[in-house]
Swiss-Prot record:
Residues 282-309 form a propeptide. GO terms for biological process: bicarbonate transport; response to steroid hormone; response to xenobiotic stimulus. Residues 1-17 form the signal peptide. Belongs to the alpha-carbonic anhydrase family. This is Carbonic anhydrase 4. It comes from the Eukaryota. Its EC number is 4.2.1.1. GO terms for molecular function: carbonate dehydratase activity; zinc ion binding. Its main location: membrane. Inhibited by acetazolamide. It is an enzyme of class 4 (lyase).
Length: 309
């Protein structure tokens, strides 16, 4: 009987991640922290098709079916609702914004976008490309639509499509990002809401002609419950924002109501790729990531053959 009571007590004090408050490593390390950092995330977070990953471009496989996307409603101007959700800044989307193409099985409706960042320009992205991390990473989250324009609620492997954009620090102000940056001061505390001045999603992204180069793999949400239901598209062309715009995120936003812990390093550690394959679109410009001899040998062979002829 005593053993049974001890086991029940242990089960009570060790709830799953879904039942307790999850957090990032920077929060879990705080004195008197009672939240579960990434190492303690449970459930699907312990499975083997998790995200984010490091994309090794030389090991990606060309997939001719990865054609350019069609973006519908991305040019729609609106005063979008934004909030501090205690883990990131989140912008609600929808209102006839959706994507198709890119070898997706059907249309996917935009639900929200959010970002991950550090206060250092090489630590804020969740994914990395050839070992390189970026200042930030923006996720535009879409859900699969069924007949009648309804969002699918099943647990299929392709339930969610996330478009991931790396964000790089540059010397010019990104006017498309500025409405969101200006709203940050109104979102300092968790669970606060505001709206951005009239803007459109398209203005936050790289030029449309540069969006045909991307990587694709099957993965998961990067936060609990880490559902393995995500088709990931990681674009090669980064978004560029000014350093001052970048720093506003870690200066203005806080994890806590007391505003003691600045929101930064909201990044899940890289997960093993395992036996998954990462694909690349035909437009991907990663040829130069190949070893130099691999590039030079065919070229020199052609030149010698031409000379002998």
């Amino acid at each position: 009987m005593q053993l049974l009571l001890a086991l029940l007590a242990l089960a009570y004090v060790a709830p799953s991640t879904e039942d307790s408050h999850w957090c990032y490593e920077i929060q879990a390390k705080e004195p008197n922290s009672h939240c579960s950092g990434p190492e303690q995330w449970t459930g699907d977070c312990k499975k083997n098709q998790q995200s984010p990953i490091n994309i090794v471009t030389s090991k990606t496989k060309l997939n001719p079916s990865l054609t350019p996307f069609t973006f519908v409603g991305y040019d729609q101007k609106k005063k979008w609702e934004v909030k501090n959700n205690q883990h990131s800044v989140e912008m609600s989307l929808g209102e006839d914004i959706y994507i198709f193409g890119g070898d997706l099985p059907t249309q996917y409706k935009a639900i929200q976008l959010h970002l991950h960042w550090s206060e250092e320009s090489n630590k804020g992205s969740e994914h990395s490309i050839d070992g390189k991390h970026f200042a930030m990473e923006m996720h535009v989250v879409h859900k699969k639509m069924t007949t009648g324009d309804k969002v699918q609620d099943s647990d299929s492997k392709d339930k969610i499509a996330v478009l991931a954009f790396m964000v790089e620090v540059g010397n010019e102000v990104n006017e498309g990002f500025q409405p969101l940056v200006e709203a940050l001061s109104r979102l300092s505390k968790p669970f606060t809401n505001s709206t951005v001045s009239e803007s459109c999603l398209q203005d936050m992204l790289p030029e449309k002609k540069k969006l045909s180069a991307y990587f694709r793999y099957q993965g998961s949400l990067t936060t609990p419950g880490c559902d393995e239901t995500v088709i990931w598209t990681v674009f090669e062309e980064p978004i560029k924002i000014h350093k001052d715009q970048f720093l506003e995120f870690s200066k203005k936003l806080y994890y806590d109501q007391e505003q003691k812990l600045n929101m930064k390093d909201n990044v899940r550690p890289l997960q093993p790729l395992g036996n998954r394959q990462v694909f690349r679109s035909h437009a991907s410009g990663r040829l130069l990531s190949l070893p130099l001899p691999t590039l030079l040998v065919p070229t020199l062979t052609c030149l010698v053959a031409s000379f002998l002829h």
